From Swiss-Prot:
Subcellular location, record wording: Cell inner membrane
One GO cellular component term: plasma membrane
Taxonomic lineage from the root: Bacteria, Pseudomonadati, Pseudomonadota, Gammaproteobacteria, Alteromonadales
Family: Belongs to the UPF0761 family.
PANTHER family named in the record: INNER MEMBRANE PROTEIN YHJD, UPF0761 MEMBRANE PROTEIN YIHY
NCBIfam families hit by this protein: PRK01637.1, yihY_not_rbn
Topology within the bilayer: Multi-pass membrane protein
Full protein name: UPF0761 membrane protein Sbal_0315
UniProt KW keywords: Cell inner membrane, Cell membrane, Membrane, Transmembrane, Transmembrane helix
Residue stretches spanning the membrane: 4-24, 45-65, 102-122, 137-157, 182-202, 213-233, 247-267
UniProt key word Ribonucleoprotein: no
Keyword Cell membrane annotated: yes
Domain of life: Bacteria
Length: 323
């Protein structure tokens, strides 16, 4: 009897995962995340130079970040633009240098284009969450401006704090010396989880549960790390883009990677948004199942006052059918 109930609970668990995946698949098809990712990739490439220009300007305003600007650039390009990071860094730094020499009107235009990217991200994620209530123009602009100005500062502060922790003498001890390479290797993964978690909790214009956002962030971060390694391996081992495009190969490589990155970001958002929908549906189904199965549960337990969980009810049904 106990073994049958345990097997039934395992079946319920895997069946629940399967039903969630089916629900997620329907959501992905309905939301057309491939089209959304393409739109965001286009806006990202259009806004890339303005975003970098604004970011570097914000970091330059704080003397503490001037000495580590090269480290910040290297960390970003190495971990977020695999296989083409060095080439892209050279071009973007040149473009940013040219952009910084522009007039006040030109710099204002760069800020507007950078805000366009943040606005596109905001609209895409809120559409995934089926958010009906929109933010006011003042609130939306304030949030975009805060992300644009405080975002680079927070990233720089995180890297400074990480560098400080790594330089502590505590890591020089023999017992902890082996932990340093592991910590450094896991640092990009930790940053990815933190960034996705913040994105999924702050951007939607509704309350998002921490555990749901954490699940989506972990899945997105894992896919992002695997995607970086897989894409870098493909570009280096199968240089078809270089054979076709020659010196212009960097352009399609960057576009494809940005597109894949947005697919991963939106997939994590879909997982986060689908969790409460699925759990609410399962809860209502469990209540109905428990109500219909009460006579069977009473007959099996011999106690009319017993309260059974949905898994126990399902298990008892399976036992009753087998008997």
């Amino acid at each position: 009897m106990t073994k049958k109930i345990e097997l039934a609970q395992i079946r319920v668990l895997f069946l629940g995962i399967w039903h969630f995946l089916l629900h997620l698949r329907r959501r992905l098809v309905e939301d057309q995340i491939n089209i959304r990712a393409g739109h965001l990739a286009y806006v990202t490439l259009l806004s890339l130079v303005p975003m970098v220009a604004v970011t570097m300007s914000m970091l330059s305003a704080f003397p503490v970040f001037k000495g580590i600007r090269g480290q910040i650039e290297g960390f970003v390009y190495e971990n977020f633009l695999p296989a083409a990071g060095d080439t892209v860094q050279v071009y973007i730094n040149e473009f940013v240098g040219n952009a910084s020499k522009g007039t006040a009107v030109g710099i204002a235009a760069l800020v507007v284009v950078a805000i366009m990217l943040i606005s596109a991200i905001d609209k895409s994620l809120n559409n995934i969450w089926r958010t009906k209530e929109k933010r006011s123009v003042v609130v939306a602009f304030s949030m975009y401006w805060m992300v644009l100005t405080l975002g680079p500062v927070l990233v720089g502060a995180s890297l400074v704090a990480s560098s400080y922790v790594i330089s502590l003498k505590v890591f020089e001890a023999e017992a902890l010396s082996g932990m340093l390479p592991i910590f450094i290797a896991r640092l990009p993964m930790l940053f990815s989880v933190a960034a996705f978690l913040l994105l999924y909790m702050v951007v939607p214009n509704q309350k998002v549960k921490f555990l749901h956002a954490l699940l989506g962030a972990i899945v997105a971060a894992l896919l992002f790390e695997l995607g970086k390694k897989g894409f870098a391996l493909y570009v280096t081992q199968f240089p078809s883009y270089e054979a076709i495009y020659g010196a212009l190969a960097t352009i399609p490589i960057v576009f494809v990677w940005v597109y894949l990155s947005w697919m991963i970001v939106l997939l994590g958002a879909e997982i986060t948004a689908a969790m409460p929908e699925y759990l609410d549906y399962e809860s209502s189904s469990d209540d109905e199942t428990a109500l219909n199965a009460k006579p069977l549960a009473d007959a099996s337990q011999g106690d009319s006052s017993s309260v059974l969980t949905s898994a126990e009810v399902t298990a008892l049904k399976a036992v009753a059918k087998s008997e």
